[in-house]
Amino acid sequence: MRYLLSAPSQIKATIQLPASKSISNRALIIHALSKGDDVLSNLSDCDDTQVMIKALTEGNEVIDILAAGTAMRFLTAYLSSTPGIHTITGTERMQQRPIQILVNALRELGAHIEYVRNEGFPPLRIEGRELTGSEITLKGNVSSQYISALLMIGPVLKNGLQLRLTGEIVSRPYINLTLQLMKDFGASASWTSDQSILVDPQPYHCLPFTVESDWSAASYWYQIAALSPQANIELTGLFRHSYQGDSRGAEVFARLGVATEYTETGIRLKKNGTCVERLDEDFVDIPDLAQTFVVTCALLNVPFRFTGLQSLKIKETDRIEALKTEMKKLGYILHDKNDSILSWDGERVEQQACPVIKTYEDHRMAMAFAPAAIHYPTIQIDEPQVVSKSYPGYWNDLRKAGFGIKVGEE
């Protein structure tokens, strides 16, 4: 299936954003480890979170997390530290995504994990047990989800957890998000130095908890505001002092002409008429926003150099290669370096007359390219249903904002 998109001349809309996937998934693991009955409110309705809920509530011996990378990592640690024998698997792409770093770390803590097929990759057979805990050292540039997975089981380890990180730490805001949520549920967990985190063996307390809206989802509406001739967009459920690192996107979009006004119910986006001539930005802390800014800058004719993209190679797809391929269809030649830098210096080629954007089973590819319809009225998005991974209501929300969406020809 493909969607053929058309954009209105001006955007005026009020959008209820989905709940934060990052907070929902962490809260579910922590809540399960607390073994309480209090309610988690406003959980995300995205695929990733629904997979997590199913795994935690049904207790099946074989757990299929489909394409949910967060669930694979968080559940691997959770299942290792709780009694029971399970096999955890996923899609073909999920079985190609490495997990050896996390498995090795869990084995150091005493976990019993076996690879079912290929060494270093899912599926995994896990015999859960009480883990002793110890000091672990990891490179700081590994996926922050590995680090968060280990941290969240820290309070239930017999001796707690001392986690030392070496070198540059990637996605530090996601680590801080995990620590803040752990503290909200009664854990004693904190940085003891710039490179070390201590988690005491102190049980979680179960309590009612409400999940805030998703700043990652908000980024696509900032993008729409930036690309539109006129825009007045209200997004509910977002706050100035957010746990989410992706809230920094508001600061970066301010340089691309989008002003943020905080209201009692959320935020209001308006164009402020000023845009930088070039954007150089480090995305090491906000990698999930990279695709959005690549498309936005190119369409605004703003050359850019984005660094800190090393984690994009092991996401739902190789996002660096995907961006280079799909942006070329729109007439832009991107260059990458060292698997961590992506840039555009203004180089153009002839665009395709009717570009069809491949999404590579990646929700963020679909949502980052859909707003390009504002500049490309013939653009089509292939496999649009992939947005259900994080923002199931995305296409309906675009319709509310005045976008036309038709099923295109294959």
From Swiss-Prot:
Any one Gene Ontology cellular component term annotated for this protein: cytoplasm
Pathway: Metabolic intermediate biosynthesis; chorismate biosynthesis; chorismate from D-erythrose 4-phosphate and phosphoenolpyruvate: step 6/7
EC number(s) given by UniProt: 2.5.1.19
Catalytic activity: 3-phosphoshikimate + phosphoenolpyruvate = 5-O-(1-carboxyvinyl)-3-phosphoshikimate + phosphate
Superkingdom classification of source: Bacteria
Active site: 288 (proton acceptor)
SUPFAM superfamilies per UniProt: EPT/RTPC-like
Gene3D superfamilies: Enolpyruvate transferase domain
Localization terms from the record: Cytoplasm
GO molecular function: 3-phosphoshikimate 1-carboxyvinyltransferase activity
Keywords, alphabetical: Amino-acid biosynthesis, Aromatic amino acid biosynthesis, Cytoplasm, Transferase
Residues binding 3-phosphoshikimate: 21-22, 26, 143-145, 171, 288, 315
Broad EC category: transferase
Binding site for phosphoenolpyruvate: 21, 69, 97, 145, 319, 364, 389
GO aspect biological process, one term: aromatic amino acid family biosynthetic process
Biological function: Catalyzes the transfer of the enolpyruvyl moiety of phosphoenolpyruvate (PEP) to the 5-hydroxyl of shikimate-3-phosphate (S3P) to produce enolpyruvyl shikimate-3-phosphate and inorganic phosphate.
Family affiliation: Belongs to the EPSP synthase family.
Assembly notes: Monomer.
Protein name (record): 3-phosphoshikimate 1-carboxyvinyltransferase
Organism: Bacteroides fragilis (strain YCH46)
Gene name as annotated: aroA
